């Protein structure tokens, strides 16, 4: 009690604030003593540490300098900026210094707060130097905290706890959020919206991996016990990275950027289809996509396939596709894979080269010669990784069996490694090769001794992989870099001695009748396979670096080429949806890229076309005057997509759900017509010959707006004025003689043979057929299925096979837009015949079919085009009526009544992609 009284008196005497009453001071002292926060040495000396309001260093006080500080203010305890680890450290430090009077005095609270503020500033600067705001990127929280601990260790700072560090991060990145990602039972918290800068030292450790292969460091992801078998469904929605842009390429010669951009976009869509089918397990359909793309290449794009720059860009795109396919098909976590999936991947790798070679027939040899080596490396890597995973799955149970491991250790202990190392083959040195003895027999003995130690430690497959990474890195890669020797030569020397030493070990096990011979043989096969995989990975990385250098040569901006080549595949769950509005023109391919399209006609025949269409000459297009409000087209070529493959015509995907959802009758199985329409002509699209295997034929001289024919035009229509494609036709009554014959009776001739040169423009003006490019309807579009002579207003419905489905013009994206969707995630069967060709159920109404002539005997010039029968029209169809289909009847209802059925008709046949389709970074509203 005397000691307590003495301390209380000292507290009152040393009170720094005279305004504070002594009663309050005594109460504070009692509280400090009661809470154990007042520490004093055994010699009863005491020195009060000041509070935050009037704190000053203990050295400034007039007391004994040997006395120690023993007060920890409650402000420090209640401050959230200090962690529990710091409190424990401070308490331990106080006790230690109090016990030893010779130690330096403890820092005051003010000094500690200054240090803490300085450390926070250093941490914020470190965050700025190594991390960046990146929308759509997730970073595991544990990895970020591990980086912080490494930073504190290097800077000799006391790290804060994870919660305090989280507050510091949000000071730098206030919009940062957290998400819990991962499979059930193995989910972890991730920071969403932050990524590691490429200039950071942590970038390669996270995104590139520290090891030599994709499986290096995978042991961290297998912690936690039970893991499910790998399934491709977990990769659903994976999108390809961006391909090189045509705008950044440096071309050689005169090449249209629009054509190059179209070709690259087509190829990316093709590659995305391959990726989607691989994820869905439809490996056999990939062959059909290859044939469809390469053999259906439009003629006007074929010359690009001979350009060296385009060929090299294709090689870069192939490398990107192969890396994504490898990441999707084979898990880097060494997760157990079903046997059926392994078999499918092996079969896919076996047939891939044959599929690609067969699809490239009759194409430039330079393209084939460049693509084959890249695909062979991909096939070799795919086979090697599947083989390694298969062996790892078999060896894992053996390594977990303690009895098997003990038997292997016991048997290998009986092998004399020194006698094997002293055999003649390993001691032979080639005098001409001074580097041949670098990997000596001593190294072989050391390596196998390390293997023996791993077995004794009950090492897992992941531990063996980590060990092999170290062996190959230290004894092959590092040595080749230091001595300047070829990596290939060094790898060959290592593999030779590794294989020989392993074979001699197995020889000794055989002679000793080792009971664990089978298990050890399995482990050796696993190690051999991984070493080969590590070597091949290094060689493939060198080849990819060559492709990167090649891309840098062709790209104007090296950063853009690096971003395109090193980008990782993204997921639909991480896609940046906020950029949809700005990227709408990039993700939807506009095949004309302009709002007007013209056809060049001879200047000597300007009067043969309607007055609303202005001919122009092709000789001097730069100085050509503009008639009226019409603008010149900037399109330099006929940019069309390849035709629909007959092999996928029955697939209900977004590729063939648009206005081209029919197959040519001459390829594959032709859709059977119903009995009441047995005389329906076979060619669905009459302008094609039966020999053509695509909708666009093989002529490179066709126009996207006007298609020249060798016969008189058979139909005229008023085009959509709001799109600005052409001026409206004058509303004049055209006689029957204007058409030159029946619109349904006269056959169409085939297009002339293909050629790369410009059109001769020798067709007569009356041999011009106007097509409705707003929608490629083959049966009843406004150009081919509307009544001759009838004038349709600009707001006339442009239905799908006769449907009066009205879509807002904002969603149609112009009359020359063909939307390309990269991800196909919906498959359905082909709709019934009646749903496609007769959605309005016209064929079932016998009253609409009348067996009369195509043209009425009256003077009315209106005759409706039909395939089988015609109607006797006594009255003219008003401009608000729909297009005719198969046959006509009385007047159609007005537009207002048709709009009421738009919703129901849209459900029957829709040209829009399904809702569950994942688009390339665009929202559904952009389609």
Curated annotation (Swiss-Prot):
Instruction: Mention any Pfam family matching this sequence.
Output: RFX_DNA_binding
Q: Under the cellular component aspect of Gene Ontology, which terms does the record hold? A: nucleus
Which tissues is this chain's protein expressed in? In the adult pancreas, expression is restricted to the islets where it could be detected in all endocrine lineages.
Q: What is its main location?
A: nucleus
Q: Where is this region: Disordered?
A: 1-21, 81-108
Any idea where this protein resides? Nucleus
Family matches, as InterPro entries: DNA-bd_RFX (IPR003150), RFX-like (IPR039779), WH-like_DNA-bd_sf (IPR036388), WH_DNA-bd_sf (IPR036390)
What superkingdom heads the lineage?
Eukaryota
Q: What happens when the gene is disrupted?
A: Mice were born at the expected Mendelian ratio, but fail to feed normally, exhibit gross bowel distension due to small bowel obstruction and die within 2 days post partum. Some, but not all, of the animals also have reduced pancreas size. pancreata had almost no expression of the islet hormones genes, except for PP (polypeptide-producing).
- What is a biological process (GO) this protein takes part in? regulation of insulin secretion
Residue ranges flagged as DNA-binding region:
123-198
Description of what induces expression: By Neurog3.
Q: Name one GO molecular function term.
A: transcription cis-regulatory region binding
List keywords of the entry alphabetically. Answer: Developmental protein, Diabetes mellitus, Differentiation, DNA-binding, Nucleus, Transcription, Transcription regulation
Describe, as the record does, how this protein assembles with itself and its partners: Interacts with RFX3.
Q: Which family does it belong to?
A: Belongs to the RFX family.
Question: Function of this protein?
Answer: Transcription factor required to direct islet cell differentiation during endocrine pancreas development. Specifically required for the differentiation of 4 of the 5 islet cell types and for the production of insulin. Not required for pancreatic PP (polypeptide-producing) cells differentiation. Acts downstream of NEUROG3 and regulates the transcription factors involved in beta-cell maturation and function, thereby restricting the expression of the beta-cell differentiation and specification genes, and thus the beta-cell fate choice.
UniProt-recorded name of the protein: DNA-binding protein RFX6
Q: To which species is this protein native?
A: Mus musculus
Q: What is the lineage of its organism?
A: Eukaryota, Metazoa, Chordata, Craniata, Vertebrata
């Amino acid at each position: 009690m005397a000691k307590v009284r003495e301390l209380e008196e000292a507290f009152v005497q040393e009170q720094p604030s005279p305004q504070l009453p002594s009663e309050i001071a005594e109460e504070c002292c009692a509280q400090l003593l009661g809470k154990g926060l007042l520490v004093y040495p055994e010699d009863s000396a005491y020195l009060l540490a000041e509070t935050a309001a009037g704190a000053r260093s203990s050295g400034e006080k007039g007391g004994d300098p040997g006395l120690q500080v023993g007060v920890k203010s409650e402000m420090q305890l209640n401050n959230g900026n200090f962690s529990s680890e710091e409190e424990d450290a401070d308490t331990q430090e106080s006790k230690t210094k109090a016990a030893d009077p010779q130690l330096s005095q403890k820092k005051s609270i003010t000094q500690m707060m200054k240090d803490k503020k300085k450390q926070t500033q250093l941490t914020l600067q470190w965050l700025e130097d190594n991390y960046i705001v990146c929308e759509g990127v997730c970073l595991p929280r544990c990895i970020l905290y591990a980086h912080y601990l490494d930073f504190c260790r290097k800077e000799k700072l006391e790290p804060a706890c994870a919660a305090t560090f989280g507050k510091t991060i949000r000071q730098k990145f206030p919009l940062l959020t957290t998400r819990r990602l991962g499979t059930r039972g193995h989910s972890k918290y991730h920071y969403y919206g932050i990524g590691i800068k490429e200039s950071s030292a942590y970038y390669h450790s996270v995104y590139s991996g520290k090891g030599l292969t994709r499986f290096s460091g995978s042991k961290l992801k297998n912690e936690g016990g039970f893991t499910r078998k790998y399934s491709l469904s977990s990769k659903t929605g994976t999108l390809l990275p961006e391909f090189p842009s045509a705008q950044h390429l440096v071309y050689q010669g005169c090449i249209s950027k629009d054509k190059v951009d179209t070709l690259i976009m087509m190829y990316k869509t093709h590659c995305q289809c391959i990726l989607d089918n691989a994820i869905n397990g439809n490996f056999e359909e990939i062959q059909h996509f290859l044939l469809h793309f390469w053999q259906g290449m439009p003629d006007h794009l074929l010359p690009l396939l001979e350009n060296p720059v385009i060929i090299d860009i294709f090689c870069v795109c192939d490398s990107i596709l192969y890396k994504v396919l490898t990441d999707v098909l084979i898990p880097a976590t060494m997760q157990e894979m079903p046997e059926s999936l392994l078999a499918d991947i092996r079969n896919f790798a076996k047939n891939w080269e044959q599929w690609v070679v067969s699809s490239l027939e009759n194409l430039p040899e330079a393209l084939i010669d460049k693509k084959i080596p890249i695909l062979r490396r991909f096939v070799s890597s795919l086979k090697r990784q599947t083989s390694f995973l298969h062996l790892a799955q078999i060896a894992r149970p053996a390594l977990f069996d303690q009895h098997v491991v003990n038997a292997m250790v016991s048997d290998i202990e009986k092998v004399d490694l020194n006698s094997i190392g002293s055999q003649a083959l390993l001691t032979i040195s080639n005098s001409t090769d001074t580097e041949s003895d670098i990997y000596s027999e001593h190294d072989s003995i050391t390596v196998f001794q390390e293997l023996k130690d791993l077995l004794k430690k009950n090492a897992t497959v992941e531990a063996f992989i980590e060990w092999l990474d170290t062996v190959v890195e230290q004894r092959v890669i590092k040595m080749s870099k230091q001595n300047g020797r070829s990596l290939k030569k060094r790898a060959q020397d290592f593999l030779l001695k590794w294989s020989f030493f392993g074979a001699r070990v197995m020889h000794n096990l055989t002679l000793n009748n080792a009971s664990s011979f089978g298990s050890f043989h399995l482990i050796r096969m696993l190690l051999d396979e991984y070493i080969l995989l590590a070597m091949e990975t290094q060689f493939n990385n060198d080849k990819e670096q060559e492709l990167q250098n090649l891309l840098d040569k062709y790209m104007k901006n090296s950063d853009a080429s690096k971003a395109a080549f090193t980008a990782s595949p993204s997921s639909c769950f991480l896609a940046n949806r906020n950029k949809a509005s700005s990227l709408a023109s990039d993700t939807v391919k506009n095949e004309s890229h302009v709002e007007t399209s013209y056809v060049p006609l001879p200047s000597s025949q300007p009067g043969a076309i309607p007055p609303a269409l202005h001919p122009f000459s092709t000789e001097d297009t730069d100085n050509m005057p503009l008639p009226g409000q019409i603008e010149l087209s900037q399109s330099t070529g006929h940019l069309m997509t390849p035709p629909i493959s007959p092999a996928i015509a029955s697939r209900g995907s977004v590729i063939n759900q648009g206005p081209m959802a029919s197959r040519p009758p001459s390829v594959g199985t032709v859709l059977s017509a119903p009995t009441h329409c047995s005389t329906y002509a076979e060619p669905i699209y009459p302008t094609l010959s039966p020999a053509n295997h695509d909708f666009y034929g093989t002529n490179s001289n066709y126009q996207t707006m006007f298609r020249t024919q060798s016969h008189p035009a058979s139909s005229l229509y008023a085009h959509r004025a709001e799109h600005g494609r052409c001026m409206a036709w004058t509303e004049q009554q055209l006689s029957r003689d204007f058409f030159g014959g029946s619109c349904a009776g006269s056959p169409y001739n085939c297009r002339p043979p293909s050629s790369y040169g410009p059109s001769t423009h020798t067709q007569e003006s009356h041999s011009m057929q106007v097509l409705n490019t707003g929608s490629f309807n083959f049966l009843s579009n406004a150009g081919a299925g509307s009544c001759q002579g009838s004038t349709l207003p600009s707001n006339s419905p442009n239905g799908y096979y006769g449907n009066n489905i009205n879509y807002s013009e904002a969603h149609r994206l112009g009359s020359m837009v063909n939307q390309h969707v990269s991800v196909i995630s919906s498959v359905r069967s082909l709709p019934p015949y009646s749903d496609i060709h007769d959605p309005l159920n016209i064929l079932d109404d016998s009253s609409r079919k009348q067996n009369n002539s195509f043209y009425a005997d009256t003077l009315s010039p209106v005759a409706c085009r039909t395939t089988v029968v015609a109607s006797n029209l006594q009255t003219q169809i008003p401009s608000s009526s729909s297009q005719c289909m198969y046959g006509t009847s009385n007047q159609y209802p007005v537009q207002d009544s048709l709009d009421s059925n738009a919703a129901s008709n849209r459900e029957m046949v829709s040209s829009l992609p399904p809702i569950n389709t994942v688009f390339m970074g665009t929202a559904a509203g952009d389609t």
